[in-house]
């Protein structure tokens, strides 16, 4: 069980990396603005600024898996991103199964604001929030 930790979660993508912050006390997460990326390479300065602002105890990176639990081509890229986060910032990083989070995020956004609300940045941020909330559930 986790007591009073702050966590940041990332939904890795080649063009955009969703981000969310959460607290273990409530087990909830809030979407933050997504980071732009070029072919999976983020603006590390922006990520560093976010880490300095929130001072997380742990980072959680969504791990994309096939529905049967096997790894896909993108899985190794997400692992590499997680390793780079740890290497650059020295913060503990854990991976969390992210199957269906993008679908759930799109459904949630559509229910709130309809088709026009479905922009990529919002989807990525809410996906990261769902990843973090499922990580909290796994550790409660």
Swiss-Prot record:
One of its GO terms (molecular function) is nuclease activity. One of its GO terms (biological process) is rRNA 5'-end processing. InterPro entries: RNaseH-like_sf, YqgF, YqgF/RNaseH-like_dom, YqgF/RNaseH-like_dom_sf. Transmembrane segments: none annotated. Disulfide bonds: none annotated. Its main location: cytoplasm. PANTHER family: POLYNUCLEOTIDYL TRANSFERASE, RIBONUCLEASE H-LIKE SUPERFAMILY PROTEIN. Could be a nuclease involved in processing of the 5'-end of pre-16S rRNA. This is Putative pre-16S rRNA nuclease. It comes from Mannheimia succiniciproducens (strain KCTC 0769BP / MBEL55E).
């Amino acid at each position: 069980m986790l007591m009073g930790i702050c966590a940041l979660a990332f939904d890795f993508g080649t063009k955009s990396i969703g981000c969310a912050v959460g607290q273990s006390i409530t087990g909830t997460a809030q979407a933050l603005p997504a980071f732009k990326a070029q072919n999976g390479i983020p603006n590390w300065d922006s990520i560093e600024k976010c880490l300095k602002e929130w001072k997380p105890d742990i980072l959680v990176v969504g791990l994309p898996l096939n529905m049967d639990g096997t790894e896909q081509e993108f899985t190794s890229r997400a692992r590499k991103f997680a390793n780079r986060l740890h290497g650059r910032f020295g913060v503990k990083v854990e991976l969390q199964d992210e199957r269906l989070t993008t679908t759930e995020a799109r459904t949630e956004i559509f229910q709130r604001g309809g088709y026009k609300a479905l922009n990529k940045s919002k989807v990525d941020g809410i996906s990261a929030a769902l990843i973090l909330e499922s990580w909290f559930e796994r550790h409660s």
